[in-house]
Amino acid sequence: MVHATTVDVTHFPGTEPVDQLDMTATFTNNEFIELKHCEPTDSLILHGVKVSVQQGLCSATTRKSNVTIPFFTPLSPGSNLADYNGSSKEGASVDAVLRTLKRLPGTCGSYSLRVDAVNVNLAAVKRNPVAVTITLPDGSSGCLSINNALIDQ
């Protein structure tokens, strides 16, 4: 479940992918509610996360722009902060920080994610609303549509 998100899209001239995405999202893995347990394969640190941005509402069939972060590296042992600096599976240059928040009862974890990515194809994202989908390593996902994305500002 995605609770909150901010999105800042900057389009650059040239052949796609050339655009920039700056975003934050706060989300919870609610798998425990469904399965009554948390799967080890759901580790965002080990298996990363996919962020998708699209114009329209969550149910829209518009093209999604994906940034898949393959894994995160803890900043220090026991730290609730982890980062990733490198290429996404789609070839974008990514700087991302994952903060593990206090685990709420009945969930498998809550997180805050910041992603700065360049060389992303965001040509289809031209106006609000904008939908952000967070896909966990097991394929489950949550989406939130917002009406206040910053586009070319």
Question: Model-flagged regions — what are they?
Answer:
Residues M1-Q153:
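Extracellular glycoprotein-like low-complexity segments
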